[in-house]
Amino acid sequence: MDKKLLFQPIQIGKLKLRNRMVFPPMNTNYSNTDGSPMELMMDYYARRAKGGAGLVVVESTTIDPTSRNHGAQSQFSDTSYIPLYSKLVDKIHRYGAKAAIELTHFGADGTVSSGGEEPAPSDVTSRGAQYSVHAMTIDDIHAMQEQYVQAVVNAKSAGFDAVTFHAAHGNIMPEFFSTLYNKRTDWYGGSLENRVRFAREIVEMARKAVGPAFPLIMRISGDEYIEGGRTLDETVEICRILEKAGIDCFDVSGGIQASYIFSIAPYNLPGLHGFMMPSAKAIKEAVNVPVIGVGGVRDPELAEKFLEEGYADMIALGRSFIADPDFGVKAMEGRSADIRPCLTCGNCFNEICCDRILTCTVNPETGREDDFKGIEEAKEKKKVLVVGGGAAGMESARVLALRGHKVTLLEKNDHIGGSVSAAGVP
């Protein structure tokens, strides 16, 4: 095996991963109307497992059917969802990856679907959503904690190897952490210890319910990137508390709903690639469990650099695996030049925000995995002439060559690309 750290096994608690490449949770809108996973979702995640990811984390999945954040919101609110999620897990396992699922309640960042008010730590609306909210009572808090624990138990019953608690990007857990939204004066507000209590009790209850061997991961924003929001120093202390409560791994991201623009690094500013890694490093130095680093890491060499320099123990490569589902395999085979790069154009994010299904500008396979089962070798090899080196001509030539034909591509200009070249001019 390659000696690079990126391809070396690692453990989260007692769970052994084949490598350190993580496909992190990102919304797809590939759910049925009841929140259960469509076959499309299953094929999508399985394809990233086939492409070499060591851990595949299924997208943000709500524990409560009344909590929604986008169009086709995935749910795991009761045991009726177990059979379909079990099928999804089996498809991921088929290719040697481990499967986790991210559990959440969106709190003030949810969208009102029934004319009611969203539950929140206090009567403070989200700066990113601006929906009506109501301050949760102690009974409300305890009921939601039970929902979280039941979802963890259900996930384990479905065969997931781990769960991730979503405490990044704005939802109920970070709302309790934050003095921007948490104005409570009881045991769940005020001091840092009190503001962490909601999440800490969930972790402790979940640990008791599923036992010591089932990994619990916490995805958390290192810095909220907003004036008055939580800073890295405070997040480090939160992680220390949650580690003692039973968290086995931290997945360190950044931003909240109101500062989401900072969650995606622009491609034309290479200096920002991996811009959240310092947050991961600070948390890694403060805890004794593995840390996943994230933030615009688009190539295996940069991922390896962050591992070697001690920024993180694993690297989340979300949009890299969306743009090229074989990112992992190509990286392990030393074919970095063959990896189709993510442009960080934001199309995937825009589609979700507009309640459409996830697609990718550079990868037509995304969202159509069932239609792209693989390019079969042609039974009869031919010599093929393709006239025109624009996008369509290049793609035709590429696929024909992969099928085994001998292809000649003709272009009247002194370069290929067609109108794509013109579109690339600043």
Task: Show where each model-derived region lies.
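Flavin-dependent oxidoreductase catalytic cores
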Residues: M1-V407, K412-H415
